[in-house]
């Protein structure tokens, strides 16, 4: 990626969106400039780094400070138009020179600690991912030369509070944010980074020994599992709109059972073979309902009413009024069939189940008895 391509906006639905840079780039730049300040013994207010994707970033330095053989500097995180929990916060680096010839990297205040296996970092270590570790160490080495050593501490005073708005606690990263970024650049509306974070939670569940997983679109699904199924939510992973991707990831990781749990407004799309459920990809909710109601012998009047609905909830009211609530069991079976069709070339296919529930947390339908599914999940 060239500097020009970094400055060029990302177009999404007709809007020009600005790129940003990761916490990893911030930490790298802060460490580099702190190392340079120790060596030169004067404050520096701007620093440049080359990101793993080849982009050169020229960043403003905040809170520079030198005290003997130690210096501190901060870079303010800018996510561009892809605003996340870390946007606008300061990422600090403290660099202390020594004669060891080695560079040691630690996480201080506001940087999370790894407490679970599955994310590729040792238990008890700072949540500074592999790529940022490499770029930080390389930038400091470039600054101090081959003979000197340095102790580098990355810290973020707002980190513990900001981390509460992230997935970190679910990933077993406690006490602060993560220093992340494989490219160093934040691309607005990037599905890949979002998908990767969801997949990472799957990897952690599998590394903990779980072989059965419940995929839900969001928090409502997790609450239903806890309150209505009586199943430990340790087995629950959010799939968001990325149904097909998360199913394939679960298969790749060797889960033997996948249970899809959600409201018909999301899961009904799977019955039509739609495995990315965001409305900008596809809708077909009413068309799918109408088709399956017709297969069950519903009268034309009901089909017309459902076809004219704008929301799944409105359609569900008509379905209930006409006594066709059994469609939800039918749809759940169809969802499982579609999943197995998608996985037809997989050597070892998992057991697939689907459970549909209403917004008031009532079970609408499932491919087989929910009690039976719940019992298996508790094994």
UniProtKB/Swiss-Prot annotation:
<dbReference type="InterPro" id="IPR036074">
    <property type="entry name" value="CbiD_sf"/>
</dbReference>
<keyword id="KW-0489">Methyltransferase</keyword>
<comment type="pathway">
    <text>Cofactor biosynthesis; adenosylcobalamin biosynthesis; cob(II)yrinate a,c-diamide from sirohydrochlorin (anaerobic route): step 6/10.</text>
</comment>
<dbReference type="Pfam" id="PF01888">
    <property type="entry name" value="CbiD"/>
</dbReference>
<dbReference type="InterPro" id="IPR002748">
    <property type="entry name" value="CbiD"/>
</dbReference>
<dbReference type="GO" id="GO:0019251">
    <property type="term" value="P:anaerobic cobalamin biosynthetic process"/>
</dbReference>
<keyword id="KW-0169">Cobalamin biosynthesis</keyword>
<protein>
    <recommendedName>
        <fullName>Cobalt-precorrin-5B C(1)-methyltransferase</fullName>
        <ecNumber>2.1.1.195</ecNumber>
    </recommendedName>
</protein>
<dbReference type="GO" id="GO:0043780">
    <property type="term" value="F:cobalt-precorrin-5B C1-methyltransferase activity"/>
</dbReference>
<keyword id="KW-0949">S-adenosyl-L-methionine</keyword>
<comment type="similarity">
    <text>Belongs to the CbiD family.</text>
</comment>
<dbReference type="GO" id="GO:0032259">
    <property type="term" value="P:methylation"/>
</dbReference>
<keyword id="KW-0808">Transferase</keyword>
């Amino acid at each position: 990626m060239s500097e020009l391509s970094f400055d060029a906006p990302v177009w999404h639905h007709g809007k020009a969106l600005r790129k940003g840079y990761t916490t990893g780039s911030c930490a790298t730049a802060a460490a580099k400039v702190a190392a340079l300040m120790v060596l030169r013994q004067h404050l520096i207010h701007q620093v440049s780094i080359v990101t793993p994707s080849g982009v050169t970033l020229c960043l403003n330095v905040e809170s520079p400070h030198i005290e003997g053989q130690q210096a501190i500097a901060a870079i303010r995180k800018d996510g561009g138009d892809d605003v996340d929990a870390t946007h606008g916060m300061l990422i600090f680096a403290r660099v202390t020179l020594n004669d060891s010839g080695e560079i040691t990297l630690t996480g201080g205040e506001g940087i999370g600690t790894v407490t679970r296996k599955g994310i590729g970092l040792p238990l008890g270590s700072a949540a500074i991912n592999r790529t940022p570790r490499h770029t930080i160490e390389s930038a400091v080495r470039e600054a101090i030369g081959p003979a000197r050593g340095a102790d580098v501490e990355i810290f973020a005073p707002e980190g513990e509070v900001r981390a509460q708005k992230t997935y970190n606690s679910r990933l077993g990263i406690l006490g602060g944010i993560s220093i992340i970024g494989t490219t160093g650049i934040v691309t607005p509306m990037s599905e890949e980074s979002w998908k990767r974070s969801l997949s990472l939670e799957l990897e952690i569940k599998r590394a903990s020994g779980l072989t059965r997983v419940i995929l839900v679109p969001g928090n409502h699904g997790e609450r239903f599992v806890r309150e209505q199924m009586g199943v430990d939510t340790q087995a629950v992973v959010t799939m968001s709109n990325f149904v097909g991707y998360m199913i394939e990831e679960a298969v790749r990781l060797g889960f033997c059972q996948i249970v899809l749990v959600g409201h018909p407004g999301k899961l009904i799309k799977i019955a039509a073979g739609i495995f990315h459920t965001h409305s900008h990809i596809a809708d077909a909710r009413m068309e799918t309902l109408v088709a399956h109601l017709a297969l069950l012998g519903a009268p034309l009047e009901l089909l017309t009413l459902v076809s004219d609905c704008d929301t799944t909830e409105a359609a569900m009211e008509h379905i209930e009024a006409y006594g066709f609530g059994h469609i939800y069991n039918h749809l759940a079976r169809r969802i499982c069939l579609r999943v197995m069709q998608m996985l037809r070339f997989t050597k070892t296919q998992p057991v697939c189940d689907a459970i549909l529930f209403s917004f008031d947390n009532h079970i609408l339908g499932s491919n087989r008895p929910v009690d039976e599914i719940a019992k298996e999940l508790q094994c």
